[in-house]
């Protein structure tokens, strides 16, 4: 699958669509989900053009990989969920439920999130 430069997250990264920003650095942008599934629901996306986790893990630099993982931790702390717990989730491809073709990690928290898969 090729990267689509017109996906909604690419437009957010370019500033064409606004977001409720939580955190940003040279590697990631984090913002609140516009349709939250839990009390706290944030998205953390890499700034590079990566379709999904497979694409990212095979093409990203070590700095980008470390930056994304560190960014998720920073966002969890900023949201106040790092001590009480949260779920980080990434969907990959159609069968995995991925809706936007730009790698993104969900952070769910602020309440018990329930079973992983029913």
Report each predicted region and the residues it spans.
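HIT superfamily nucleotide-processing domains
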Residues: 1-118
């Amino acid at each position: 699958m090729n990267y689509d430069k017109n996906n909604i997250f690419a437009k957010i990264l370019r500033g064409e669509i606004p977001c409720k920003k939580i955190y940003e650095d040279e590697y990631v942008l984090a913002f609140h989900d516009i349709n939250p599934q839990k009390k706290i629901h944030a998205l953390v996306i890499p700034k590079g053009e990566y379709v999904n986790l497979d694409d990212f893990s095979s093409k990203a630099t070590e700095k980008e990989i470390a930056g994304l993982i560190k960014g998720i931790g920073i966002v969890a702390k900023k949201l106040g969920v790092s001590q009480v717990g949260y779920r980080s989730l990434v969907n990959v491809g159609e069968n995995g439920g991925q809706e936007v073709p730009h790698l993104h990690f969900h952070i769910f928290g602020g309440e018990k999130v329930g079973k992983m898969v029913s």
